[in-house]
């Protein structure tokens, strides 16, 4: 049987939420109610050999329902929002052709925005420019490059942490390639873009948001401790032994991995590494919640409520 035209399909359910908000549990519960296939919306889960620190679903969970865009690239490679859009659109069509329902699950809000609102026209990544910026960062540190960014693009610099290496590098790269601040380029593109509301009709967005952020913070600390007890440091040691990975790669910049890498370099002690890993995860959580709350089409569920899974199921309508 051929797939129905897109307009005849129900909206694609997108289950979005910050780290430790219970997305996996809710998604697996939905899979018990309907023939779904999960499309991961997570920039860290794409990497092979990075299981513990990314809180990747267990083998049993992965086997219980089809998952996509997990374990698809090597840690030496990178994966972009553009690649996600291409892969997600292909997967949505393939899943529907099998008579199943696609369920997008994750917390990489940039990927969701690219899928539903389109990609921007910023310059493509330039390996030579990035290599030069990596050299500068190695010499001076990322806070120094953050200061450089503040001189040429204060708007972008103001919303980035001084150690947000990946985003600082991208903003400086765009400025070097275009001669213009990234914030101005994005503002001009937003001014010239009109949205028809089609995204609202094609996607049903369920957002897991905490009524009490302290509960989520406690979960984050407990989960990070569980990762450390479960072999996270040994996982990073195995990655280091490969010999082809370094802290400048997007994979090793993932929250948690960067902090453990620094610990294994001897730059910090265990207690400092643990604290920095928890703080970095909480900062990621804060950014994710900010993104979610700027998404007007979302249907909000309190992820610390005892019946949040049941609420998600009702809103999903599967």
UniProtKB/Swiss-Prot annotation:
Reaction equation(s) it catalyzes: adenosine(37) in tRNA + dimethylallyl diphosphate = N(6)-dimethylallyladenosine(37) in tRNA + diphosphate
Q: Which cofactor does it need?
A: Mg(2+)
Task: Tell whether Nucleotide-binding is among the UniProt keywords.
Answer: yes
UniProt-annotated binding residues for ATP: 17-24
Query: Is Transcription among the key words of this record?
Result: no
Keywords, alphabetical: ATP-binding, Magnesium, Nucleotide-binding, Transferase, tRNA processing
According to UniProt, residues marked as the site described as Interaction with substrate tRNA are: 108, 130
For region Interaction with substrate tRNA, the annotated ranges are: 42-45, 166-170, 253-258, 286-293
Q: Which domain of life is it from?
A: Bacteria
The EC number on file is: 2.5.1.75
Q: Which EC main class describes this enzyme?
A: transferase
* GO biological process entries: tRNA modification
Q: Which residues bind substrate?
A: 19-24
**Molecular function in Gene Ontology:** ATP binding; tRNA dimethylallyltransferase activity
The task this protein performs is described as: Catalyzes the transfer of a dimethylallyl group onto the adenine at position 37 in tRNAs that read codons beginning with uridine, leading to the formation of N6-(dimethylallyl)adenosine (i(6)A).
Q: Which family does it belong to?
A: Belongs to the IPP transferase family.
Q: Which NCBIfam families match?
A: miaA (TIGR00174)
List the HAMAP family. Answer: IPP_trans
Please give the PANTHER family that the UniProt record associates with this protein: TRNA DIMETHYLALLYLTRANSFERASE (PTHR11088:SF60)
Q: How does it assemble?
A: Monomer.
This chain's protein is named tRNA dimethylallyltransferase
Originating organism = Cupriavidus pinatubonensis (strain JMP 134 / LMG 1197) (Cupriavidus necator (strain JMP 134))
What high-level taxonomic lineage is stated for the organism? Bacteria, Pseudomonadati, Pseudomonadota, Betaproteobacteria, Burkholderiales
């Amino acid at each position: 049987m051929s797939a129905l035209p897109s307009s005849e399909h129900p909206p694609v359910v997108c289950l979005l939420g910050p780290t430790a908000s219970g997305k996996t549990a809710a998604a697996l519960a939905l899979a018990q109610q309907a023939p779904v296939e999960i499309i991961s919306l997570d920039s860290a889960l794409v990497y092979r050999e990075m299981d513990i620190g990314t809180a990747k679903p267990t083998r049993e969970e992965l086997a219980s329902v089809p998952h996509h865009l997990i374990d698809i690239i090597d840690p030496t490679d990178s994966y972009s929002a553009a690649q996600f859009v291409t892969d997600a659109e292909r997967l949505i069509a393939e899943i529907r052709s099998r008579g199943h329902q696609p369920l997008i699950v994750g917390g990489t809000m940039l990927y969701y925005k690219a899928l539903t609102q389109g990609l921007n026209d910023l310059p493509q990544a330039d390996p030579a420019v990035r290599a030069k910026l990596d050299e500068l960062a190695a010499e001076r540190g990322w806070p120094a490059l953050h200061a450089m960014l503040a001189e040429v693009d204060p708007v972008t610099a103001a919303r980035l942490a001084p150690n947000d290496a990946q985003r600082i590098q991208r903003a400086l790269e765009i400025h070097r390639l275009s001669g213009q601040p990234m914030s101005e380029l994005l503002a001009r593109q937003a001014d010239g873009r009109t949205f028809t509301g089609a995204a609202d009709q094609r996607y049903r967005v369920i957002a897991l948001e905490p009524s009490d952020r302290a509960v989520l913070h406690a979960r984050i600390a407990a989960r990070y401790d569980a990762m450390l007890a479960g072999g996270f440091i040994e996982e990073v040691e195995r990655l280091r032994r490969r010999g082809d990975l370094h802290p400048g790669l997007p994979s090793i910049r993932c929250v948690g991995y960067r902090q453990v890498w620094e610990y294994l370099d001897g730059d910090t002690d265990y207690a400092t590494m643990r604290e920095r890993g928890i703080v970095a995860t909480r900062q990621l959580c804060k950014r994710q919640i900010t993104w979610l709350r700027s998404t007007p089409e979302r249907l909000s569920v309190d992820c610390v409520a005892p019946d949040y899974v049941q609420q998600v199921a009702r809103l999903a309508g599967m």
